[in-house]
């Protein structure tokens, strides 16, 4: 998991209203080393070493070892962050498959190589600084339940990029031709009916959440966003109101919704994803295994996931959110800045005020 530009944009947007430490996770700071090296122009190799005394098993999603074009590094030029043009995934922390984990013995290293020009426009060329900071989710024993985190901070690597060569790197995310609000090819029959109901559920969730953010219970808002600043409450309500508008029509909107994985990014355990730069949302096969409607608790249903994905879409509300944490336990550990920029905090809040959780 990587902290990146949209997180900083939201923090800057609200300034002193969120003047809290950026990271207050309860997690390990020792035992993990990450080194980035250049493999030529825009190709980068990341080597992760377990310097601890125990074997670790970590979740690959949203890390260097994720085969999908998720954000793996932060790229800066002349002090400015380069926008990320890949995908944001949603997965259910309560249902992670064993194949989504990677194991590292004490002293062992694992490496991954990728091209940063596949998810960022580096065609101007010149000098760039590449780094990565975040955490790995650690599973306990031989299971798949996340029991801890290990923070890391890589070296800062300087790259002198040939812009012409970078421009020739194929984008990891093909551009689709937008024809309709809901893709008619993938959203036929039962999928189309279920998605229509999911949009209705999304509208209901977001509508109640907008009202609760505007003038609802202060303690409940504090629980999910770690502040009761009027400025923050106004911003959260505005995002929910924008989502209500997006969910209210199956024919008009700012996003394109795919009921199937046209890009072939889905893996076991992944439920849905958003491509913010294209305003595209796509469901994975696991999405259709979720219950269409959940009336109690905070577990995801179809409408919950739509709210989550729509918070990522900058065309609906800018800046879009990121994925600092998933599920109630992780999201409760986020500070105010992270909570405001985290997609699942919005879905959880919407579910809580709608279901009385």
Curated annotation (Swiss-Prot):
Keywords of this entry: Cleavage on pair of basic residues, Disulfide bond, Hydrolase, Metal-binding, Metalloprotease, Protease, Secreted, Signal, Zinc, Zymogen
Presence of the UniProt keyword Signal in the record: yes
Binding site for Zn(2+): 308, 312, 323
Pfam family, any one: Peptidase_M35
Chain positions listed as propeptide in the UniProt record: 20-179
UniProt GO BP: proteolysis
Cofactors required: Zn(2+)
Cofactor binding mode and count: Binds 1 zinc ion per subunit.
Class of the enzyme per the UniProt entry, highest EC level: hydrolase
Main location: secreted
InterPro entries: Fungal_M35_metalloproteases (IPR050414), Lys_MEP (IPR029463), MetalloPept_cat_dom_sf (IPR024079), Peptidase_M35 (IPR001384)
Active-site residue list: 309
Free-text function comment from the UniProt entry: Secreted metalloproteinase that allows assimilation of proteinaceous substrates. Shows high activities on basic nuclear substrates such as histone and protamine.
Protein name per UniProt: Neutral protease 2 homolog UREG_02006
């Amino acid at each position: 998991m990587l902290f990146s530009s949209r997180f900083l944009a939201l923090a800057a947007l609200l300034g002193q209203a969120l003047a809290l430490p950026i990271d207050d996770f309860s997690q390990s700071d020792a035992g993990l080393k990450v080194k980035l090296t250049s493999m030529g122009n825009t190709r980068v190799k990341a080597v992760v070493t377990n310097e601890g005394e125990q074997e670790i098993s970590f979740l690959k999603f949203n890390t260097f070892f994720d085969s999908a074009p998720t954000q793996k590094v932060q790229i800066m030029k002349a002090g400015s962050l380069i926008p990320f043009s890949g995908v944001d995934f949603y997965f259910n922390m309560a249902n992670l498959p064993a194949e989504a984990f990677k194991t590292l013995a004490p002293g062992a290293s694992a490496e991954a190589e990728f091209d940063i020009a596949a998810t960022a426009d580096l065609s101007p060329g010149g000098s760039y600084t590449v780094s990565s900071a975040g955490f790995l989710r650690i599973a306990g024993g031989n299971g798949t339940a996340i029991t801890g985190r290990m923070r890391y901070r890589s070296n800062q690597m300087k790259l002198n990029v040939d812009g012409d060569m970078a421009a020739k790197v194929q984008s990891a995310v093909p551009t689709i031709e937008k024809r309709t609000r809901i893709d008619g090819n993938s959203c036929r029959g039962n999928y189309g009916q279920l998605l229509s109901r999911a949009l209705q559920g999304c509208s209901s969730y977001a509508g109640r959440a907008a009202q609760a953010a505007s003038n609802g219970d202060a303690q409940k808002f504090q629980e999910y966003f770690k502040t009761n600043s009027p400025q923050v409450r106004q911003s959260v309500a505005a995002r929910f109101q924008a989502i209500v508008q997006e969910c209210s029509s199956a024919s008009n909107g700012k996003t394109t919704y795919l009921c199937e994985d046209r890009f072939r990014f889905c893996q076991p355990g992944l439920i849905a994803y958003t491509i913010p730069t294209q305003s595209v949302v796509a469901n994975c096969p696991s999405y259709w295994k979720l219950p269409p409607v959940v009336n109690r608790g905070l577990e995801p249903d179809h409408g919950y996931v739509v709210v989550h994905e729509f918070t990522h879409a900058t065309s609906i509300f800018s800046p879009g959110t990121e994925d600092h944490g998933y599920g109630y336990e992780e999201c409760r550990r986020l500070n105010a800045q992270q909570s405001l920029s985290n997609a699942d905090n919005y879905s959880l809040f919407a579910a809580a005020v709608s279901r009385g959780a």
